[in-house]
Amino acid sequence: MAVQQNKKSPSKRGMHRSHDALTAPALSVDSTTGEVHRPHHISPNGMYRGRKVVKAKGE
């Protein structure tokens, strides 16, 4: 088991944890359908950047 050499100060501990905060996922709106999707991903209906690229389920 690893044992620390020196105690980490509260300041250094806080600096270490500074990038641990959760962020909300970025969302884009499709210009054609107005549907919300993740950037650089196709929307649920199979559209990407105004073009139909994949057949949606049930089509």
From Swiss-Prot:
CC annotations in GO: cytosolic large ribosomal subunit
Instruction: Tell me the first and last residues of the signal peptide.
Output: none
The Basic residues compositionally biased stretches are: 49-59
Q: In which family does this protein belong, per the annotation?
A: Belongs to the bacterial ribosomal protein bL32 family.
What is this protein's gene name?
rpmF
The protein's organism comes out as: Neisseria meningitidis serogroup B (strain ATCC BAA-335 / MC58)
Q: What is this protein called?
A: Large ribosomal subunit protein bL32
Q: Which UniProt keywords apply?
A: Ribonucleoprotein, Ribosomal protein
Q: Keyword Glycosyltransferase: yes or no?
A: no
Query: What are the top taxonomic ranks of the organism?
Result: Bacteria, Pseudomonadati, Pseudomonadota, Betaproteobacteria, Neisseriales
Q: Name one GO molecular function term.
A: structural constituent of ribosome
